[in-house]
Amino acid sequence: MSDFKMLMSLKGRVAAVTGGAGHLGSTMLNALAEAGADVVVIDIKREYIDPVVSDIREKWGCRAAGIAVDLEDSEAAATIPEKIVAEMGRLDILVNNAAFVGTSGLTGWNEPFERQSVETWKRALTVNLTAIFALTQAAAPHLRASGHGSIVNVASIYGIVGPDFRLYEGLHMSNPAAYAASKGGVVQFTRWSSTVLAPEIRVNAITPGGIFRNQDPKFVGRYESRTPMKRMAREEDFIGAVVYLASDLSQYVTGQNLVVDGGFSVW
């Protein structure tokens, strides 16, 4: 029987995270590196990637590499797994984290519904959902070969519940339709692909609640008042979830959506 530390260890495995230079992505990469993995930072610009790669190498003494790619280009996204294997020798864990989020500065995005644009809707679905399809499809042969293949898709509470617009009243904030639709798609694609790729590859999702990013104090107060844990999330709240789903601690878990939202969605 394996012990807890052995099941949790990612030693000898390679983990890649899209959106890896961002707040949540870099936190997840550090957690995976601490658990023993070598890591690959995937993001849109090399200038964002390189500092994260250097920091992880220095902090954890592991191998770390970076790949710059625009996930709006699905063909480019599909080349990522091959590049990872060429540089790192293998691919065991894929965390699909990159996304346009509610605060992304897109035209026709963070607007009342009537002013949200079809073009931005299409862009969001391409990055938030189509890129996950392309990456999963291209990564599948390598993840099967690993013997420990795990995919973790990052969804959102707005993929499982409708928005409470009372949170946004009187503020220059909104809740884009394309964000909710794409994240709902992530949850269902997780279920679908978990049955298609089993038993060699496990596929699960993490659904984060709202993360504190110095939002308007009125929004923060409203959000916290309707959350049982009485606070917004912090990046470190997701460390346990990603290591659990990436590692053999969850070796009999697939097709699941782990909701980490402080109870926001249980009302």
Feature locations, PLM:
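Short C-terminal tail/terminal secondary-structure segment
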Residues: 2-7, 163, 170, 243, ...
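Canonical Rossmann dinucleotide-binding motif of NAD(H)/NADP(H)-dependent dehydrogenases/reductases
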Residues: 7-40, 193
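Conserved glycine-rich Rossmann-like NAD(P)H-binding loop of the short-chain dehydrogenase/reductase
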Residues: 36-51
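Short, small/polar-rich loop/turn modules that mediate ligand/substrate recognition or access, typified
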Residues: 95, 148, 198-202, 253-255
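Catalytic Tyr-X3-Lys loop
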Residues: 100, 114-133, 152, 179, ...
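Substrate-binding pocket helix/loop in short-chain dehydrogenase/reductase
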Residues: 105-113, 117-122, 175, 223
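Catalytic loop of short-chain dehydrogenase/reductase
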Residues: 118-120, 144, 152-185, 190-195, ...
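Amphipathic alpha-helical dimer-interface segment in Rossmann-like NAD(P)H-dependent oxidoreductases
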Residues: 123-147, 158-159, 191-199, 247
